[in-house]
């Protein structure tokens, strides 16, 4: 079940966030992001944050926020994280599908992913399957912990027609 995240969910979200950010191979957050900073980034700054819960356990989370104010406010941005023990179960796909429905309900017309590491093959394949296009390449913009500097992609999908 996907539902809005509650403040009391943070203790279950934090280990997912911390593990993903510490590996340093997908998100551009500092690997040493502390718990309170992470909570603001994931739970406070976004317009909404959601959790994927199964049998009372939080297995994934995503945020949805306005990508830019003013003339670009019709475009939203999302970030998704899935617990390492729950990967390969289709949770990211379900959260992405859910986020698109919520985005349209919130008045957004498009969704943009700002910084997808070119080395993140699993995410790239999924987002492409879900109709997102690579609309920009940032050469050597992501410093991968083992591969060094790799490109980052901007991905985009129009949601309304």
PLM features: residue spans?
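Helix-loop element at the rim of GNAT/NAT acetyltransferase active sites that forms part
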Residues: 14-31
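A short beta-loop-alpha structural element at the N-terminal edge
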Residues: 1-13
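Conserved catalytic-core motifs of GNAT/GCN5-like acyltransferases
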Residues: 112-116, 128-148
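Acetyl-CoA-dependent GNAT
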Residues: 7, 26, 30-85, 96-98, ...
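Conserved GNAT acetyl-CoA-binding A-motif
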Residues: 103-116, 125
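Short glycine/proline-centered loop/turn elements that form peptide/ligand docking sites
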Residues: 96, 120-123, 140-145
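Short hydrophobic/aromatic beta-strand or adjacent loop that forms the aromatic wall/cage
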Residues: 47, 150-154
